[in-house]
């Protein structure tokens, strides 16, 4: 009897341990593995994660700091190229008579480039960071070469699609490099640090573009970066490959032959990659986001069958993906434990809110400043850069704050979200020519500081909730959630503008100019600034812009309210714990 009782007790104890193991969170399991085997790669991790761990286990502090410096240079080059491209693309448009084809390519490349981050994240884990980086650097360079050498809109469209896919992928992989080489406590500061090139390129980019326009051509403005990117980015990948080989030679990383036939390898990667789940999720995002972009550029209306059917099918595919991942996927595309995590859900909602807010008030902000405040191009550009520069500078300070306090949730909830709400709300009041522009600068600073807090906090939330394997996928998820919110914000801003500006303009114009209202509206800021400040026509135009901006700012302010419950969903993580192995910052 006693033996039976002891056996039952042992069985119950084992069952309790297994049950407890199932309830342990992913981040706790990851930390336990690091504490128990700090100098060994994680044996059950995917090969890409093992390579990243092996690199960190064999390189020195000097190599780590040098690599960070080189990553900063890569971000500087990437941001500089993007800034120059944003200015030179208008001169490229001028050379083609079929610009709408370029707009279609812009829509598709933006959507595809964003959605591809999910399979890229999976590829980095299954294959390796350096390998994926080299592939997409190649795609980026090929895209730039095609753009620089194209002879028409079709060639430009093809090149721009390749360019944008490569650009978003390379930017994403650089962020993953930083996550691999930083501890959780210092990661917020590391992320903010690599964003600081924006401060330089925000002002240098337009000047460089002007120099290219004055002394060269738009083709060379693109083409020269094919050379610069090759000699800047390839050495970074070779550094990671060098230390990976060093880890193999020292026995830290042992590559075991799989022994699989080509057919078995295909089946293995088909199962590990979860192609069905990847297809469902990518299709859901594409079908949902694409119609909003098509509407924004005038290719499809809200009432069209194309718009409605694509949005409905896209929305329905999200629960289909969730059901597949939960009950049918042999290997989950996104770990179910992360998929249902309240912190991850709240972070995705917040990302959508941030981008919805930004694109709602920002879409027509440039033209509003030019017309209502009669600013020249340079001063308008400086005004629109306040958010980028301000949020970047503040993010560095917030990164230091997180390092010292070891927490971020309360700061986002009680400082970041209220400050963004305050800035957006004050924009409602201080819009229009009757208000001094200094008040708008103040509002922009509030929004920038709030945004800098929330963006860094959002990234930290998903990374703190994930294990080492899940970090790339979580970064991709909040990026996609941001695209989700941004697409809706674009569409809402466009709808508000189209339904308020023409009517307000028609009401305000003198009777003898009412017949020109369509020309003034369709001509945009270029036609509107031709009317002298103080004239009846210019006053009517300013009033129309004020009305349009009022409703856009009201919408942007209202959506920020959702940030509070989204942040409240987060777990109040302590970042003073282990998430990565080896020598990291």
From Swiss-Prot:
It is found in: Cell membrane. Keywords: Cell membrane, Glycoprotein, Membrane, Transmembrane, Transmembrane helix, Transport. Induction: Expressed in copper depleted conditions via the regulation of the macA transcription factor. Glycans are attached at residue 341. The keyword Metal-binding does not apply. It is a multi-pass membrane protein. Disruption phenotype: Does not affect the xanthocillin production, nor of fumivalines and fumicicolins. Its main location: membrane. InterPro entries: MFS (IPR011701), MFS_trans_sf (IPR036259). The keyword Glycoprotein applies. One of its GO terms (cellular component) is plasma membrane. One of its GO terms (molecular function) is transmembrane transporter activity. Disulfide bonds: none annotated. Pfam families: MFS_1. The chain crosses the membrane at residues 64-84, 107-127, 130-150, 158-178, 188-208, 220-240, 275-295, 304-324, 344-364, 382-402, 410-430, 437-457, 473-493, 550-570. One of its GO terms (biological process) is transmembrane transport. Major facilitator copper-regulated transporter; part of the crm gene cluster that mediates the biosynthesis of a yet unidentified copper-responsive metabolite. In contrast to crmA, is not involved in the biosynthesis of fumivalines or fumicicolins. Belongs to the major facilitator superfamily. This is Major facilitator copper-regulated transporter crmC.
